[in-house]
């Protein structure tokens, strides 16, 4: 991953930094944000940085965190209806302040914009800790897919206020950066998503698996990975596949 932005210059400015990531979703949950953060944490630790994570307690099997674990702190959360396994974090200003006074991070990265994230931004600012935010999900755009389009201006107004309070906002693509800047969001930088070339490599090509798909060595296998949901823009994926079929080659 690479990012020409303030947070990355601060991370690289010293031999080791303590970075605290505040998020409502994290492995073993399976979704894009959780996987992205897992790779970010692994990459930072590989570079010698200390990374701690604050996330909501998912279920009773999560061990209670009655003291400040320097790696993972569990806070109160509520399940999100219709989104199994994910909890929205409740405000946790006192818990965060206690943890950060005991193990003060050099910077805080707030990956999600819920009540937990809002309290993290306020607490970090009160303690004069640099705080950055991540814009991972277009929640304001999702509303129109669930007959709540009238809420879109209110949701985006909240998101804009949230991110404007932080030192900078990290987004996954240049396109999203440009769109956010066009609507008045400042200090937006790109934290690109890398590709694990050890995992995604032709060396892992499996003829037996392709045979079960009915795909020959000369054919191109087209795969969609993700939830089947309105906001995933599956129509575009289908249109892209149809366009590929009009070209040369065999696809499946």
Label for each model-derived stretch:
Residues 1-76:
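N-terminal subdomain of nucleotide-sugar transferases
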Residues 37, 44, 222, 237-238:
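A structural motif in glycosyltransferase catalytic domains
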Residues 57, 175, 194:
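Carbohydrate-associated surface elements
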Residues 70-99, 147, 151:
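A short, charged, and often flexible helix/loop element on the N-terminal side
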Residues 96-117, 127-134:
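Short N-terminal targeting/anchoring amphipathic segment
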Residues 130-132, 141-161, 171:
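Nucleotide-sugar donor phosphate/pyrophosphate-binding loop at the beta->alpha transition
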Residues 201-215:
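A short helix/loop element that forms part of the nucleotide-sugar donor recognition site in Leloir-type
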Residues 215-232, 238-242:
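Conserved donor-binding/catalytic core segment of Leloir-type glycosyltransferases
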């Amino acid at each position: 991953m690479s990012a020409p932005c303030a947070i990355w210059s601060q991370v690289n400015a010293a031999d080791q930094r303590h970075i605290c990531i505040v998020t409502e979703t994290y492995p073993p949950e399976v979704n894009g944000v959780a996987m992205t953060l897992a790779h970010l944490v692994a990459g930072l630790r590989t570079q010698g940085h200390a990374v701690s994570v604050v996330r909501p307690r998912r279920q009773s099997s999560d061990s209670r965190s009655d003291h400040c674990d320097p790696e993972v702190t569990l806070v109160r959360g509520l399940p999100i209806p219709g989104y199994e396994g994910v909890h929205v974090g409740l405000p946790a200003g006192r818990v965060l302040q206690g943890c950060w006074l005991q193990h003060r991070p050099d910077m805080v990265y707030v990956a999600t914009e819920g009540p937990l994230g809002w309290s993290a931004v306020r607490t970090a600012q009160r303690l004069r800790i640099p705080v950055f935010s991540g814009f991972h999900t277009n929640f304001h755009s999702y509303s129109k897919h669930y007959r709540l389009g009238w809420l879109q201006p209110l949701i985006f107004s909240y998101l804009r206020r949230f991110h404007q309070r932080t030192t900078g906002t990290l987004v996954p693509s240049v396109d999203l950066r440009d769109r956010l800047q066009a609507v008045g969001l400042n200090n937006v930088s790109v934290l690109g998503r890398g590709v694990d070339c050890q995992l995604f490599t032709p060396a892992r090509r499996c003829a037996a698996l392709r045979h079960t798909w009915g795909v020959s060595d000369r054919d191109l296998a087209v795969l969609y990975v993700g939830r089947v949901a309105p906001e995933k823009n599956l129509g575009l994926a289908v249109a892209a596949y149809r366009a590929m079929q009009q070209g040369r080659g065999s696809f499946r």
